[in-house]
Swiss-Prot record:
[4Fe-4S] cluster binds at C357, C417, C420. GO terms for biological process: L-leucine biosynthetic process. It is an enzyme of class 4 (lyase). Binds 1 [4Fe-4S] cluster per subunit. It holds the Pfam family Aconitase. Signal peptide: none annotated. The keyword tRNA processing does not apply. Its EC number is 4.2.1.33. Its cofactor is [4Fe-4S] cluster. This is 3-isopropylmalate dehydratase large subunit. It comes from Mycobacterium avium (strain 104). InterPro entries: 3-IsopropMal_deHydase_lsu, Acnase/IPM_dHydase_lsu_aba_1/3, Acoase/IPM_deHydtase_lsu_aba, Aconitase_4Fe-4S_BS, Aconitase_4Fe-4S_dom, IPM_dehydratase_rel_enz, IPMI_cat.
């Protein structure tokens, strides 16, 4: 990787700088560039065929030291000392363990102190660093862009290519600037920013782009908040999301297990501090959000772009002028069993899920505990609080958060993807409605027939207490 990210004569965006520093072979105008990959993250769902391909070709993993695996999607979040009940899930986890042992890849298995969701584990260990290229066979790899890394999800054939070569053929992406300036009102969070953005530009608004999030409201976010924003870039159709590193980034990384130390830290800092979009650099697209105008946000439909402020009502498809939008809304409302004009705050839930690679970090759990402290989960509501990693769980326990959750009547679980997706035992029953801090509200995402409303941790906690979609201010 070069050290001249800020010294070129032509103004460049942050994404262009990281890209240029990783071009092994330029493809010119007609072919993809060959891009070097600094960190490859692996889990049990998208890797089995990739390892099989290596085995059939007689190839090793080229850089096992730059590869990390963890078990997250299929693992249960209770009784983790017992065999996994579902045979498909059990096979995938056992296959990952065999593959990692055979190919010399680091693995954090279920029960390990460092196990957790891959996009929580990488940053907390200091493996994710500014200026890196990061890939994983998982859509939400964009999370790591919060550190100024170029991070993206890839398919299984690409996973095999990276395992074998530590490179990936890619064509340059378009660039989009999302400018969020102003001060966020009290109770408005990073999750509300990204849900509002997706509602504004649509689930295809960022297609083919790398989004750079900029502006005073973004700069004021913690690293956890920045990861939440970048995590859902894919829900806006983008290939990746990035935020330029700054003092908040450096303080988060300092003294992490795999962060540079001593003179290496000083050298890294000199490079990292150049990772900013140059004055005069041109983005293909620019979008603006006024932070002061934002409020707690919630989805009503079956894609992340179908969202409104919590203070609003379920929209009426008949008032939509675009035919495709109207038809999608009608279909979504039928699945969600909602009526136009219903105030969002009147919608009752059966379950609340706190967790996922979007909102399963310690800051998220602190927010939830602050709301739940001294209160009880509403009768008839099931609440799952699932830490994004065992390290997050240990920290939450040390801070007494686990006791707050259980005292309120919530289920305090072990680490994993859990109810974000129907690949493990934590699922909704058909017809159940859930307020979830995760990232996708597709039909059946949390279990066949389940209905999902995407919310922030603060809204999730307040909803659990009131039993209807609510913000903490509604509890006063």
């Amino acid at each position: 990787m070069g050290i001249d990210a800020g010294t070129t004569a032509t103004p460049r965006t942050l994404a262009e700088k990281v890209w240029d520093d990783h071009v092994v072979v330029s493809g010119g105008a007609n072919e993809p560039d060959l891009i070097y990959i600094d960190l490859h993250l692996v889990h049990e769902v998208t890797s089995p065929q990739a390892f099989d391909g290596l085995r059939l070709a007689g190839r090793p993993v080229r850089r096992p030291d730059l590869t990390l695996a963890t078990e997250d999607h299929n693992v249960p979040t209770i009784d983790i000392d017992k065999p996994i009940a579902d045979p498909v899930s059990r096979t995938q986890v056992e296959t990952l363990r065999r593959n990692c042992a055979e190919f010399g890849v680091r693995l954090y298995p279920m029960g390990d102190a460092e196990q957790g969701i891959v996009h929580v584990v990488g940053p907390q260990l200091g493996l994710t660093q500014p200026g890196m290229t990061v890939v994983c066979g998982d859509s939400h790899t964009s999370t790591h862009g919060a550190f100024g890394a170029l991070a993206m999800g890839i398919g299984t054939s690409e996973v095999e290519h990276v395992l074998a070569t530590q490179t990936l053929p890619l064509r340059p992406f378009k660039t989009m600037a999302v400018n969020v300036d102003g001060e966020l009102p009290a109770g408005v969070t990073a999750k509300d920013i990204i849900l509002a953005l997706i509602a504004k530009i649509g689930t295809g608004g960022g297609q083919g782009h790398v989004i750079e999030y900029r502006g005073s409201a973004i700069e004021s976010l913690s690293m956890e908040g920045r990861m939440t924003v970048c995590n859902m870039s894919i829900e806006a159709g983008a290939r990746a999301g990035m935020i330029a590193p700054d003092d908040t980034t450096y303080e988060f990384l300092r003294d992490r297990p795999h962060a540079p130390k001593g003179a290496q830290w000083d050298a890294a800092m000199r490079y990292w501090q150049q990772l900013r979009t140059d004055p005069g650099a041109v983005f293909d697209t620019e979008v603006y959000l006024d932070a002061a105008s934002l409020s707690p946000f919630v989805t009503w439909g079956t894609n992340p772009g179908q969202g409104v402020p919590l203070a609003a009502a379920v929209p009426d498809p008949e008032l939509m002028t675009d035919d495709a939008e109207r038809q999608a809304a009608e279909k979504a409302l039928a699945y969600m069993d909602l009526r136009p004009g219903t105030p969002m705050r009147d919608i009752a839930v059966d379950a609340v899920f706190v967790g996922s690679c979007t909102n399963g970090r310690i800051e998220d759990l602190r927010v939830v505990a602050d709301v739940l402290r001294g209160r009880k989960v509403a009768p008839g509501v099931r609440m799952l609080v699932v830490p994004g990693s065992m390290r997050v769980r240990a920290q939450a326990e040390a801070e007494g958060l686990g006791e707050v959750f259980t005292a309120a009547g919530a289920e305090w679980r072990q680490a994993g993807c859990s109810m974000c997706l129907g690949m493990n035992p934590d699922q909704l029953a058909p017809g159940e409605r859930c307020a979830a801090t995760s990232n996708r509200n597709f039909e059946g995402r949390q279990g066949k027939g389940g209905r999902t409303h995407l919310v922030s941790p603060a809204v999730a906690a307040a909803t659990a207490v009131r039993g209807t979609l609510s913000a903490p201010a509604d509890l006063d």
